[in-house]
């Protein structure tokens, strides 16, 4: 799946990111001036109580927010309501690689009952994993939650190597092995394809560490079905057009300077142009809220767009390989997708139960594109397959919002509960056996269980430029889980 990034015949794409950064730097004094208008909100200022004063303040805030660079938000989940009482939730990073952090939202012992945890595989599609904050909150009353927190490519030094679709599949496979099969997986949007590929390859190799269940939410498994504007654009332009026009280099002084990426600001522009009228109306409504003094509605607007406008860069190789395999060649449903020279055949999947979720009004992943996975995974018994299409729900609504909490979450929770104990002999829930007890000495004793290697060798040796680990140093990975 290694996509070769061909040299360009022109440099317009290469300087695109530099022009964007220059524009941000040039507007910095203006943003500071606009931000200083917040002083007008002081209750001692008489203008605060006039329509003219509030109108000026609202205009300044909208302009400042339109030119701001939005950093990655924090999850900020401190508690969860379980069985009518609030319990503490701790956010822990239990494993990491240069391009992915595995976060664990661990509930207080009063909320844990030994259920297999849920692993959320976040999409690597331009937004941070924090876009699934509401998804994490919705499942914490049911079980512990893990999530893949993909890293911004502009923040990863070029010395850390490349990250393509094969590396994504390897990362997912490695995380599956951490749980030794005692985990449920929810793949959101783009991540559905590599999750299915990783599972199929593990099944073909006889690896029993595949998940108990795989739930796919709006995944583009076969984009030939009900093509959307996104699918049509990919076919109309072709791979070479995207390579020449949207691939650029990270500028100085970012840590990933020199890395070829698909910048997040281009992805965000595409998302917003798909629903431009809705976004303009939302900002007009915010101005009206501020003029009327409706701080509650304005704060909800700020909260949503602080998340929505925070974007990350994707490596060029991952973007182009995904574009080719998923949107142009449709390799996965045709059993033509390969990873490290191994052919991915969905018919090999037979252990996990499978559920698909779609939104009736999804304008990114068309109706049937995700559901087709049930037909392609022919070895999964019909009794272990389920599908739900949420009426009147768009793409974001299949993993956030009121309808998600009231209609989708209960169905997913019942599906997981049904298959919790279907496969005996798994490890205890979560990564318990991989963590070293705090009261144990650091030296290994004959009575202490030996931790398995946390990272598969394919992750370690996937790039020839990386420094090869020794087996002794690989044991340090398990210590990171303490």
Label every PLM stretch briefly.
Residues 363-369:
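Conserved alpha/beta-hydrolase "acid-adjacent" motif
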Residues 187-195:
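Gly/Ala-rich beta-loop-alpha elbow adjacent to hydrolase catalytic centers
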Residues 1-85, 434-437, 442-444, 454-465, ...:
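N-terminal targeting or regulatory segments adjacent to alpha/beta-hydrolase or S9 domains
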Residues 386, 390-436:
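Catalytic active-site module of serine/aspartate enzymes centered on a nucleophile-bearing elbow/loop
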Residues 155, 167-183, 196:
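Conserved acidic catalytic loop of the alpha/beta-hydrolase fold
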Residues 356-358, 362:
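Short beta-strand/loop motif that positions the catalytic acidic residue
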Residues 1-51, 181, 198-317:
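Alpha/beta-hydrolase-fold enzymes
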Residues 79, 87-89, 93-154:
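Short, surface-exposed "cap/lid" segments of acyl-processing enzymes
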